Structures are given as C-alpha cells and as structure tokens.
C-alpha cells in the first residue's frame, strides 16, 4: 500500500537535494569530482559516443564536451553532456535518495493502493491526498527554457550525437516528449527517441501501445497534434518520464513528488502544451496523424540494432 510513510521516505528521511535544474546537478557533480570537461573539439558523429561508452563501462564520471563538432564541420554553440547517470551513486544523487528501493516501494503503492488499509485508517488516505495535491504542477508565465528563442529553428545546429556506426542518423536519446489527451486535456510525458531527419523534421519512435500514439488516434487524421520535446531539466523530471505510473497520476505530479517541490511549467510559444519551465531546450512542433517516415536503424540499450520501421514525423515550429 502507499502510505504517508512512503511519502516521507522520499520527502524527509533521505533527502539529499531538490534540484532546481540540470545546471545545479552538474555543478554538484563537478564539486564532487564526478564530472570532467573536454575543451577541444569532439565530433558528434561516433567520437563523442565512443568516449562516453568507455566511461560508462568503467564506471567513470559524467562528461561535458564544450566544443561538439556538427555534421557540417562547425562547432556547436551548445555543449553536450553525456553519462549523467552512469553509476548507481549518481543515479541516487539525481533522485535525491540514498536507496532507490524507497522510490520503487512508493511506485508500487501508487499502482496497487491498499484500499482496506486506508479504510481502517482514513486519516492516512487524507494525508496522502493532501500530499498529492501539493505536488500539482505550478503554472508560470515564462520559464528559463524560453530565455533564448531560435528565430529560424534548425535541429542541425544542436549537438545531437550519432552513437553507433549503423545508426540511421543522429538520435535524441534522452528526450522528454510531451503530448496531450485531446479529450481530457491531461498531459503525458514519455521518453521516445527522436531521429533528426533535417532542420525541421524529427522521427518520433512512439509505439502503438504508448500514450502519445493513443493521443494521435484521438486527434484524428484531419488535425495536427501538438508535440514538444524537452531536453535536460531537473533529473527527477527525466526519471518521471520513464516511470510506470497509474493513469490518475501525471508525470508532472510524480516529478514534483520526487524532487520534493512542485514542478514549474510554462506554456509553449507555438502550441498549447505546458512544459517544465526549467528544462534546457524545448523543441516545439506538431505531427500529422497518419504521416510516417522510415526511422532507424538504431543501436538500442539491449545490445542490438532496432531495424528500420515507419514512425510519425514531427514538424518543428520553435526551439
């Protein structure tokens, strides 16, 4: 069952830090000698991925490439961070706990609440409900993610790595993809890799059983579906995107629970989605349900390449 004790495990007893943004987390890694920087140019095609792969396998530190080289030979204006959560200790630090089992127990309780236990001790359910309401996201007029707006959005200007030799192209591998249920307005945030097709086109690998695919079906082929891809942000926000949550708990609420404070969200500039305000990038756009393009191959985490397959195309309207 989920009880107020489970909540306290995360929010009181083993608190390490509540992260404001990714920068604060990286500074903490730097100060604890868990981060290295490479100041000379490193190619986004295979080279950066090769270095990160060696660090992961050795249990090495996180890394920032200050001068990632793009496909056209230019140096990107933006640094590239990799291997952020490559050890158990860094993962625990990112989540603000000493033992991730605490979070697992809470997630099990959220998915399988003990109704009988709550009926016997109704004040426990009330405390839990109040705690949940305090985790509701907070809407703000403008977020840090909108401090700079790319007037002519161009995905090829971002340091997106091609990690493996047979990959079909550069892939965003830690994206927070935000969509909205057109019937209820409920936002969903999932992690679906994105292949860069060009300046304003991205292939989105959401499978038929994912919420984003359900939203596209409900939108209908005659309408555009708004999409936003968020990069970076407080580490618990990234974790919430891959967590198996019950339908009545949003990723935004769970991110607030993990980070011990309400998640600030702000409205996109070119569509009506609300996104985490402290992420580093927001890529706004839309898909046209039914429009697909060949995505892949992609070297996946289980050690094999995913083959080419048809997936939705996102048209970028703002970065």
Features from the language model and the residues they span:
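Extended, highly charged
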Residues: 7-313, 317-319
């Amino acid at each position: 069952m989920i009880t107020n004790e489970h909540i306290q495990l995360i929010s009181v007893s083993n608190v390490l830090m509540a992260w404001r943004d990714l920068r604060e987390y990286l500074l903490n890694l730097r100060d604890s000698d868990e981060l290295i920087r490479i100041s000379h140019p490193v190619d986004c095609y295979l080279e950066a991925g090769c270095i990160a792969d060696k660090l992961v396998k050795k249990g090495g530190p996180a890394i920032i490439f200050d001068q990632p080289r793009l496909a056209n030979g230019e140096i990107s204006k933006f640094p590239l961070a990799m291997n952020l959560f490559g050890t158990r200790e860094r993962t625990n630090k990112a989540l603000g706990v000493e033992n991730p089992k605490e979070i697992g127990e809470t997630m099990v309780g959220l998915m399988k609440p003990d109704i009988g236990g709550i009926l016997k001790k109704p004040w426990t359910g009330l405390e839990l409900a109040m705690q949940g309401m305090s985790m509701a996201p907070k809407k703000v007029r403008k977020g840090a993610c909108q401090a700079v707006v790319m007037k002519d959005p161009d995905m090829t200007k971002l340091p997106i790595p091609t990690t493996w030799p047979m990959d079909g192209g550069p892939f965003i591998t830690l994206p927070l993809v935000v969509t909205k249920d057109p019937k209820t307005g409920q936002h969903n945030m999932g992690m679906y890799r994105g292949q860069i097709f060009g300046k304003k086109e991205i292939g989105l690998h959401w499978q038929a059983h994912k919420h984003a695919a359900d939203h596209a079906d409900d939108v209908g082929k005659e309408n555009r579906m708004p999409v936003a891809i968020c990069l970076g942000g407080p580490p618990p926000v990234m974790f919430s995107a891959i967590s198996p949550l019950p339908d009545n708990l949003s990723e935004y609420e769970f991110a607030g629970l993990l980070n011990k404070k309400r998640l600030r969200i702000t409205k996109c500039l070119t569509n009506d989605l609300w996104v985490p305000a402290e992420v580093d990038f927001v890529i706004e756009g839309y898909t046209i349900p039914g429009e697909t393009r060949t995505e892949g191959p992609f070297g996946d985490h289980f050690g094999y390449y995913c083959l080419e397959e048809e997936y939705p195309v996102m048209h970028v309207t703002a970065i």
